[in-house]
C-alpha cells in the first residue's frame, strides 16, 4: 500500500475513533454517581480526608499508582506531571500509592513531580475502588497486587461520589508515549519504560 493510501486509511480509522469518543462522552454524561466514604489517607503533612483533597474545586482526579517499584506507573506519572498545572486549573489532582509519605517525598523529588500525593496504605480505598486484586481474583495472577488507574470524583450534596474510573496501561488514552511509538512501522518493538536512561 502506498504512503498516501496508508495515511488515508489511517485517517479514516482515526475518524472512527473520534466518533467512538463522542459516544463515550455521551455515556459519561449520563452516569449515575457512586457514593463513596470519606476515606482518610496519610498525607505529607498528616492524615487527610478524601473530601479535603478537593481543595476549592468541585472535581477531583485520583491516580491509582502502584508505587515506586513500577516503571510503567512512573512513566504515566511523569506524563501527568507535565500537564499538572493545566489539569489543576480545572480540577484537583492527587496521586495515591501504597508507599509511605517519606518514601513518596524522596521518589517525587527524584522525578521532579509537582502534584500532591497521599498514601492509601492501611485503608480499603484501593480495593474498594477496584484497584487491588486479591489472590484468586480473575486477574490476580496467583497473588495480590495493586492495579493502576484513575478515578474521577465530585462533591455533591455534602458528600463525595465517584463519576468515572478506568484502568491505565499501554495504548490507553492517558500516556502519549505509546501513541507516538505506534506511528513507527515496528511499533514499540519490545521497548519498555525504565526509571533511568543511559
Outline where the language-model segments fall.
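Short, charged, low-complexity amphipathic alpha-helix
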Residues: 1-12
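N-terminal "domain-start" segment that seeds a small globular fold
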Residues: 15-53
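Short active-site neighborhood of thiol/selenol oxidoreductases, capturing the structured segment around
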Residues: 50-71
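Conserved helix-turn-beta segment immediately C-terminal to the redox Cys motif
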Residues: 68, 75-95
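Hydrophobic small-molecule pocket/channel-lining residues, especially in calycin-type beta-barrels
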Residues: 69-72, 82, 117, 130-134
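Thiol-based oxidoreductase modules, predominantly thioredoxin-like and allied folds used
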Residues: 88-103, 114-125
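A short acidic (Asp/Glu
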Residues: 105-108, 129
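Thiol/selenol-based redox catalytic cores and closely related redox-interacting motifs
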Residues: 119-198
Amino acid at each position: 500500500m502506498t504512503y498516501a493510501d496508508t495515511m488515508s486509511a489511517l485517517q479514516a480509522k482515526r475518524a472512527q475513533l473520534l466518533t467512538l469518543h463522542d459516544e463515550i462522552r455521551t455515556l459519561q454524561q449520563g452516569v449515575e454517581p457512586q457514593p463513596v466514604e470519606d476515606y482518610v489517607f496519610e498525607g505529607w503533612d498528616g492524615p487527610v480526608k478524601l473530601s479535603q483533597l478537593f481543595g476549592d474545586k468541585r472535581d477531583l482526579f485520583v491516580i491509582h499508582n502502584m508505587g515506586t517499584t513500577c516503571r510503567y506507573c512512573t512513566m504515566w506519572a511523569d506524563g501527568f506531571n507535565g500537564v499538572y498545572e493545566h489539569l489543576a486549573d480545572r480540577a484537583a489532582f492527587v496521586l495515591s500509592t501504597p508507599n509511605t509519605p517519606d518514601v513518596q517525598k524522596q521518589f517525587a523529588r527524584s522525578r521532579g513531580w509537582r502534584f500532591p500525593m497521599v498514601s492509601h496504605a492501611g485503608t480499603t480505598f484501593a480495593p474498594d475502588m477496584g484497584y487491588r486484586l486479591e489472590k484468586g481474583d480473575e486477574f490476580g495472577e496467583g497473588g495480590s497486587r495493586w492495579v493502576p488507574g484513575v478515578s474521577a470524583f465530585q462533591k455533591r450534596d455534602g458528600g463525595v461520589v465517584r463519576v468515572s474510573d478506568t484502568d491505565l496501561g499501554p495504548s490507553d488514552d492517558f500516556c502519549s508515549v505509546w501513541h507516538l511509538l505506534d506511528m513507527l512501522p515496528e511499533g514499540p518493538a519490545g521497548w519498555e519504560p525504565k526509571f533511568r536512561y543511559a
